[in-house]
């Protein structure tokens, strides 16, 4: 009987020890959309839009607030990439607990400049439009508001949520074609 109890205790101890699989680097597939969207974290950001693993090819895109070490994103292209995801020991209070590193660019597909896409211009009263030198998204992407400048100003003043539909003019310049 004592041997059985001892055996069960040893088995219990072995199974209770953590394997720390969570801390092992993982490799995942990602698809990165051809345009960035806006987001709110510890401030206002331009975010990549991504799909991971089984979600690749779906209509669902997630805002990605991290960076991918070794990846040089260029607007106007959809990227299929493979990344290594690692746990960060003792991450900063305002930082991520995950580190993403590019392992491989599997494919790159250029998207037609006429392809429309939506960007959140204002979320919960927080506007992402800056006017330091014309209309821009967070002083990073120029916006040609076309004949919609007055409507854009009015919506930014009076609505808590504003979404713009755009098309690409150049790498870092987009044209507003519709507002909601």
Where are these regions (language model features)?
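Positively charged n-region of N-terminal signal peptides that target proteins for export
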Residues: 1-4
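Bacterial signal peptide processing site
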Residues: 18-21
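Intrinsically disordered, low-complexity linker/tail regions enriched in polar/charged residues
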Residues: 36, 40-61, 85, 137-142, ...
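N-terminal post-signal-peptidase region of extra-cytosolic proteins
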Residues: 60-70
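C-terminal motif of bacterial Sec signal peptides marking the signal peptidase cleavage site
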Residues: 13-16
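Flexible glycine-rich surface loops and low-complexity tracts that mediate binding to linear polymers
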Residues: 79-88, 158-170
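Structural detector for short beta-strands of small beta-barrel domains
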Residues: 23-45, 112-130
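OB-fold/S1-family single-stranded nucleic acid-binding modules
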Residues: 92-112, 170-180
